[in-house]
Design a protein with these regions (language model features):
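C-terminal motif of bacterial Sec signal peptides marking the signal peptidase cleavage site
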Residues: 9-13
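Bacterial signal peptide processing site
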Residues: 15-18
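Short, solvent-exposed recognition patches
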Residues: 68, 72-135
Length: 194
């Protein structure tokens, strides 16, 4: 056998076994995230003049991500706002601690997918917004000290994702913005590409 024929047979043999070893389960459809608490479906959107929101944080952010962010996935609760011209499809999670003998929420995480764009948030927040990147994704951060809340808004295919951390001042010394960049960094990979 000539060396050229041997190489051709070797290449053919490799490529056919490569094809045979591909499993049918290796499809491009991602598995849904693991979520232990079911929530009602997202409400109907009206969105006159805007696209519908496809990313639902209540069904697309896994219990693992919520736990890694420091919140209790068993407190998963729908938190939506539907208006005629825009929508927020959201989910809320608590972190509870025993304070003075009572188990109370000391921190809350709210994740809202909206068809309001990042540019619209920039205009609305003006000079109080700071440009940042979350895992390379365009975003802004701002806070509302009077509401004990901090926000990161990231650009998405739907418009933007609003990540809000809030604290209950009487029950914790933590500030709302203390860990929000880490929290947003954990949530960002669930969005796919923007």
């Amino acid at each position: 056998m000539t060396p050229l024929i041997s190489i051709a047979l070797l290449i053919t043999g490799c490529s056919s076994s490569e094809t045979e070893n591909k499993s049918p389960s290796a499809s491009s459809t991602p598995r849904p995230p693991s979520i232990s608490v079911s929530v009602k479906p997202a409400p109907t959107q009206y969105n006159q003049g805007r696209q519908s929101i496809n990313f639902d944080p209540c069904t697309n952010v896994s219990d693992t991500v919520v736990s890694q962010a420091g919140f209790d996935p068993s407190t998963r609760e729908r938190d939506d706002e539907i208006h005629d011209t825009y929508s927020f499809i959201g989910c809320k999670f608590d972190h509870k601690e025993v304070v003075r003998g009572q188990n109370v929420p000391t921190r809350t995480l709210t994740i809202s997918s909206t068809n309001i764009t990042l540019d619209e948030f920039r205009k609305r927040e003006g000079i109080s917004a700071t440009e940042i990147k979350v895992n390379g994704r365009d975003a802004i951060t701002y806070n509302r000290p009077d509401a004990e809340s901090c926000f990161i808004v990231m650009k998405t295919n739907d418009g933007s994702l609003d990540v809000q951390t809030s604290v209950s001042g009487p029950f914790t010394s933590e500030k709302p913005c203390d860990r929000i960049r880490d929290v947003a960094g954990l949530i960002e990979p669930t969005l796919g590409s923007a």
